[in-house]
Amino acid sequence: AKTPMWSRAEVRCTLKIASVTPLAGDPFFPPARLWQLSGIGGPDAFQVGLQCAGFVVVERTDLGDHQPIPNHLVRTLLAKAHALGARLVVTEKDAFRMGSDLARFPEVAVARACLDVDEHNARLLFDPVDELMGSAIEFYRCDDARRFCN
C-alpha cells in the first residue's frame, strides 16, 4: 500500500495576528497600545503574536485556560487600559466564550488570527488532497465505478 504523502510530510506554518478590531469601530493598527486579557493556555504566545504584529502590550491579565471572564473584570480592565492610553484586547476564543456578554462592551477589541503557510508547505497540505479528489473523480467516471455502484 502506498503511504499517503501527507503522513510523511512535516508541514510548518505560523499563527499570526490578522487584525485587532473592536466590536464597534475601526480596526486598531500598530503601534496601538493594548492591554491583553486572556483565558487561554498560552498567554505568552498571544503576547508574542501581538508584539510581532507591531502592537505594544502595556499590560496583561492572564486567567486560567477556559476560566470565565466576568463582566466586572472587563469593566475594571477597560478603565485601567483607558488610563494608560491603551485598548483592551481578547482572543477570538475568549470573545466566543464571552458570548452575548461581549456585546455589552463594544470597545473591547478581538484579535483575529490567521494561519500563515508558505507556498511549499501549502503544496504539502493541498497537493495530496487534489490528487485524492482527482482519483475519486476518475474512479466515478470509469465503467468499473458504474458496475461497483449498481
Regions found by a protein language model. Name each.
Residues 1-150:
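ATP-dependent carboxylate-amine ligase
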